[in-house]
């Protein structure tokens, strides 16, 4: 190959070196071609062949005959405009010595290319890695530790959703592992509410999941059933989910499948736990059984070291609260074992085998179940109260437990009579929901002989109804009307509702729409004359200003003040036997017309009874009085007398009916000229026979 030295002169070589060194500072204008013009480069071949040292494909000749070097990127070069928005130096920076320097540009320096961090995005990426690693290793402790270190606990519902959705598309082994991990993380790493929120999100997205997972409905139903069996979801989750999901969506199908296919079968817990083969992990029930065996063996031989070793080998540090709970129950059930059990718990705490949080959690679980334990161990509460101070003084139970338990103790009466009353009333209410027999319920309450606890009964009645269907809610409202007439005072109702509203926030944890439902109960009580509108003011003054209870009372007032509030509230839960108000009015009119034309009194009374709406009997009174005026037939008063004598229509309902007629006398007089004279005659007769309250005469006169 020929040398380039024979082509260029020494002066030309020097100019070429200078040009190469300063190429970055040259203008990219098409007029800046003077360099190569100055070099005076000519082809020795007359422009017909390549020159040695200058590759042919990088040299082109312009129409003027000048050579121009072209960039390999194809975007021009010296003597061209170059790329759009092209810069000479990718690493260029702002020069403060430049005459055109603008200090404002510094503010943007380094910001243009800086990435924007999204915490949720980062969390999602990290969570997928944690789950994948867990499915590979099966190490619950590492997964729990990684999730705890990740922070961002507010995003944990997403972890629940992601874990289950990833497991749904894998083998049974991963499904079992996912269930085990959720049980491990429950309460310690992920809060119960976050577990519930995660499953709610899954239910709402199951339509999308079903596109990729054909049996998504069945698999998710099994996950929910397993969560309920493992006690990380409450059974009421099914009822609450149905209320917020449309019946047409697959999420609703999931709930129905879980309820009917998995949780209603005999021995469903065992079946659900073995559905995925149990993987390499033991189920919750098996773990509980092993814990019981360890404690039983320990009580027999007293070997603390061996018992600690066995507990450690279980490998369920997240479930140690169950060890604490079962140990305490064993100590209460067998007083001779108490000292050994306390010794074991102290040893596990000092060794760090059972953490402080697990110890407190175990004690809390026992405290919450004392009422049930008392059925088998009568002195359970007394024994438990004696164990707590020993544990705290021994240094293996945190002092915070005593403070909390004392506060709980203030809320729940120490009186054994009250505890027994609560148990008895639950049975009475449940029987009423099955039989719909109000007289029998009233007799049962009278047999209990504890009128001072009437507010407690009211609270328990509505609390149980809140977690049931509309039928039971309507039955509860009807019962309130009956109790107001027969057994309870207005003060009982006020105190009962205050108790309900004080605990409204706690109730809302289990019943999602509790506040709205309580507002309906309050408003319905006013419509049924169980409470007066002024009573709502009395209730409100006894509640904290910005509490959930106060908001509920405000909602009740809004419901009452709405147009046609009476009819709407009477229909809110179906109106007793399911009739709407207009149907009931039509039935009443027909039975009164039939009676007026020669019907039998006993038959008319039976028809009124069959309506099943004692809270609406004031409508019977009103229509009977108006019909008597229109027909000029006082025979209808005989029916009212018979109804009052049988207790079918109470004094309150009778008074309310007369009051409604009194309020509409001006309108009635347009069609019935002697309406006022007739009404005064009927009212006088009612007063003489004790049908209506004495106060009615004063208000009617006014």
Swiss-Prot record:
A motif (Nuclear localization signal 1) lies at residues 273-280. GO terms for molecular function: mRNA binding; ribosome binding. Pfam families: MA3. Involved in target of rapamycin (TOR)-regulated translation control, especially under energy-deficient conditions. SUPFAM superfamilies: ARM repeat (SSF48371). Disruption phenotype: Increased susceptibility to dark and starvation, and to treatment with the TOR inhibitor. Decreased translation activity associated with altered ribosome patterns, especially in the dark and starvation conditions, in which mRNAs distribution is altered and rRNA abnormally degraded. Slightly early flowering time under long-day conditions. Gene3D superfamilies: 1.25.40.180. Coiled coil: none annotated. A motif (Nuclear localization signal 2) lies at residues 458-465. Keywords: Cytoplasm, Nucleus, Phosphoprotein, Repeat, Translation regulation. Phosphorylation by S6 kinases (e.g. S6K1 and S6K2) is modulated by cellular energy status and TOR activity. It is found in: Nucleus; Cytoplasm, Cytosol. Induction: Induced by dark and starvation but repressed by glucose feeding subsequent to starvation in a TOR-dependent manner. Belongs to the PDCD4 family. The lineage of its organism: Eukaryota, Viridiplantae, Streptophyta, Embryophyta, Tracheophyta. Binds to EIF4A1, S6K1 and S6K2. The association with ribosomes is modulated by cellular energy status and TOR activity. Residues 57-66 have a biased composition (Basic residues). SMART domains: MA3 (SM00544). Residues 39-66 are annotated as: Disordered. It comes from Arabidopsis thaliana (Mouse-ear cress). One of its GO terms (biological process) is response to carbon starvation. The gene is MRF1. GO terms for cellular component: cytosol; nucleus. This is MA3 DOMAIN-CONTAINING TRANSLATION REGULATORY FACTOR 1. Mostly expressed in vegetative tissues, such as leaves, roots and stems, and, to a lower extent, in reproductive tissues, such as flower buds and flowers. Residues 122-243, 286-407, 420-541, 583-702 form the MI domain.
